[in-house]
Amino acid sequence: VYMQDTYFAQVAEQTVSNMFSNLDLTKLSKVAQLMGSMSEGRCFSMYSFDEATEKTISDAGFTAQTPSSEEHPQAGVYVTEQNPSKMGWYIHRTSKITRSACNNDGSQTYHVEYTMTNTIDDNQIGIAGAAGTYILSVNADQQGRGVEKTLIYAPAGGSLTNLQTSGGTVTGSRQETLNGKTVYASIANIGPGESVTYSFDVTTSIKAVSDLTLSLI
């Protein structure tokens, strides 16, 4: 496993090196466009421990942030695979947002459903198993399972209520504060063919001028 991780790290390092080598105006323009679209989709993020450099990076939109705009509300749903495996490849994620109320104060209320489905089947488990524990998990009791740490944020200036889960096994549900913001944390353990759905209601700030969207990882 460690040798494979080292290999992927070397590939990533070489890819980034090639991306920024031999830059001309045409290549620089393409790289900038790609970085912008990837950062919007949270496929690319940068952070610097130098405060001045980080401010420049953050102002350019390249540092991933939790929801911060009251005018353009986003609820954050951030998922991190806790099973030492490559099971994240098999976890299919879908979301649904339904407006449920236009409130007198100008805020909007929405119902949100976020579902994670473990799509791996017995045939795929057999194929993946041939690669050893690298794909399915180094932990024998978790092989083929998605173990998803899930953090849910209300939109800036808004609120989140009626959080419920269904399907699979969800443990460690708690409300805590992270970097000054309220976050709803839990662990979803999803077996082969199983799904876990998080459902909750979101009310935006009265300053909202656009519909609710989700900020996802």
Q: What spans do the regions from the language model cover?
A:
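Lumenal/extracellular ectodomains and adaptor appendage modules
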Residues: V1-I217
